[in-house]
Amino acid sequence: MAVAALALLALLPQALGQHNSSYVDYNVEANPDLFPQCLDTISLSFPDCQSGPLSKNLVCDSTASPYDRAAALVSLFTLEELIANTGNTSPGVPRLGLPPYQVWSEALHGLARANFTDNGAYSWATSFPSPILSAAAFNRTLINQIASIISTQGRAFNNAGRFGLDVYSPNINTFRHPVWGRGQETPGEDAYTLTAAYAYEYITGIQGGVNPEHLKLAATAKHFAGYDIENWDNHSRLGNDVNITQQDLAEYYTPQFLVAARDAHVHSFMCSYNAVNGVPSCSNTFFLQTLLRDTFSFVDHGYVSGDCGAVYGVFNPHGYAANEPSAAADAILAGTDIDCGTSYQYHFNESITTGAVARDDIERGFIRLYANLVELGYFDGNSSSSNPYRSLGWPDVQKTDAWNISYEAAVEGIVLLKNDGTLPLASPSEGKNKSIALIGPWANATTQLQGNYYGDAPYLISPVDAFTAAGYTVHYAPGTEISTNSTANFSAALSAARAADTIVFLGGIDNTIEAEAQDRSSIAWPGNQLELISQLAAQKSDDQPLVVYQMGGGQVDSSALKSNAKVNALLWGGYPGQSGGLALRDILTGARAPAGRLTTTQYPAAYAESFSALDMNLRPNETTQNPGQTYMWYTGEPVYAFGHGLFYTTFNASSAQAAKTKYTFNITDLTSAAHPDTTTVGQRTLFNFTASITNSGQRDSDYTALVYANTSTAGPSPYPNKWLVGFDRLAAVAKEGGTAELNVPVAVDRLARVDEAGNTVLFPGRYEVALNNEREVVVEVELVGEQVVLLKWPEEVQGVAGDE
């Protein structure tokens, strides 16, 4: 028997111990019981294409196509060897000199699941802010820089055998409902414009471009599709079967995945745990073949990985398959190429014996994975002449970390929610605010700064460390914890506040209550944090500033702080990464000026209690008491709106476009014109939204611009409140009259809407295109003529995925 098969047999008792007759109730339990080897971070090495057993095989011929090279490799496998390598932890084929490989690496906001050393070289990698904070900068270049640095560090670790060549990132699900525990991993609640832009910049940064000569790392767009709940009300993500209309699928739950495939050319997708409309995502031919490959133009030989344990989930808890061999067969035939788990490795033999699958079905998925590894230079030796990324090493990790982009991302993303003029604080060197009370469960945070999916960082700078280093006399007292109701430490916090010139409370939420497999039950401030803030506000003197930092990925209802005149300023700081303390400090002191904007809506606490978080319908519905979801459809009054963010200065916007009566475009002319620079006619620029932005205040500052569209005449009713069509960030607009020119292209398809059948349609009618929530500049646009379908939504038919 092949060595690879023997290696897997050694693990069989553990695997069977998992999958026995006393099944875990995964309709409630949200963590899959993965066997230890699935979680392994193995030492990686490269095939020897110079003198090893594969050296004469086509896989080692760099002039052949990636597909032909991968197919030639797979043709050498016995059936047992092929099946043994279909999981994320692949034992390789020792007789062929093919080393073990681990598909599962993470790079959400830095390297995770890397083989870090205890100290010295390869003992850390840069820990960036969580995506929800970086996205709040509304800076596409920044996201690309972050991803590029992550991929450089990933390749350096890979060359040392400490990290894989493909990563299970980015998470581009939308932060639809505020209780979601993994919203921190995403860019926010807007799908096509914000999340799609984030996906494009992150993926092209990770992969080294759109169509790079040398693929840097292979990114994975996850989780496809309709995944945005962990365990709300004891409904496990592993067993959720969500109902989504074709209209909402096309309009909200998949457009960012379309951009990832069609435009960014992502090399991998991950299918999700949940089922949609009765079909588990990893056995959903409509998702994995009809949409991804036939409609979204997923790259040739791009591969699909199941989320870890999701193939098993087709059987338990979904019950879509009668047993685990049938689940494995359903998934591979639908288009799930690699199983992050063990179902393929342990049950394909039975699936083949029963005739449910053939060797060709299994080969198809494995060839796709290894065609990617070919493109990544896995078989091309150690020479940098064959692949420039093979020369990267520890000095490149140190060099890219020294660029300080983690700090930059944090300061650019922090959002100023409220300010009565107290901020920025005067510095100790000016003879004011020499002492500061840092109070709250985030005041001395270190590991908390990283959020989830983090690796070892070079350093973690807490707020206490940062203010101490700046020369402040720091009075630190936690006062309370994230979720406690104990007031035992209130008195120490109140004493610290009385001893200081300035009070800063740092609290909110963290990964103890929002995390993978853990949703929140409420979006109110947890525990007794608001009570402590109220007491701090009540005792402070009128000339003593009280500033509150609301931390964490999800929003909490801060209406009590918004209305309390004694709370002088309120900011949102997310999970700010390794330099978080410095970023939080520098925003308060004015060393840097805030220009971030919320990428989610801050709802009143009652919102999360008024309807089911499993209601995936975006549009308001009186019957279900759904008040509408996201800024596009919410019918209530938010505490702070999507896109809200204040500055330390005053900006004025003016535009010659706004003086124009109206732009009129003929739909037939628009959709029949040549578009040599874009993949589709819908991606053509309709017009450029322009404005002059003048800083009339007293501080230099970046300016963030969000451009929205709205209509009350075009397309089907109901009509959304508005939707984002573009954004930009203007850097360092000079104070006292400095001016910068804003130019945001608005594509044809940004004015399109989605009909009930899921088709993306350009409808005739009148539209307004406006700058920011304040509508500082408004341009009127009219589309005339007959409506035109820009993207036809395919009919859902479940079947077997075809060959390429």
Swiss-Prot record:
pH profile of the protein: Optimum pH is 4.0. Retains greater than 90 percent of its original activity between pH 2.0 and 7.0 at room temperature for 3 h.
SUPFAM superfamilies in alphabetical order: (Trans)glycosidases (SSF51445), Beta-D-glucan exohydrolase, C-terminal domain (SSF52279)
GO MF annotation terms: alpha-L-arabinofuranosidase activity; xylan 1,4-beta-xylosidase activity
Biochemical pathway: Glycan degradation; xylan degradation
Activity relative to temperature: Optimum temperature 70 degrees Celsius. Remains stable up to 60 degrees Celsius for 30 minutes, but loses activity at 80 degrees Celsius.
Glycosylation-annotated residues: 20, 115, 139, 234, 243, 349, 382, 404, 433, 444, 485, 489, 621, 652, 666, 688, 710
Catalytic activity: Hydrolysis of (1->4)-beta-D-xylans, to remove successive D-xylose residues from the non-reducing termini
EC number: 3.2.1.37
Subcellular location: Secreted
Domain of life according to the entry: Eukaryota
Residues forming the catalytic site: 307
GO cellular component annotations of the record: extracellular region
Signal sequence bounds: 1-17
GO BP: any one term: xylan catabolic process
Pfam families documented for this protein: Glyco_hydro_3, Glyco_hydro_3_C
Role this protein plays: Xylan 1,4-beta-xylosidase involved in the hydrolysis of xylan, a major structural heterogeneous polysaccharide found in plant biomass representing the second most abundant polysaccharide in the biosphere, after cellulose.
Family label: Belongs to the glycosyl hydrolase 3 family.
Protein name: Probable exo-1,4-beta-xylosidase xlnD
Taxonomic source organism: Aspergillus japonicus
Gene symbol of the encoding locus: xlnD
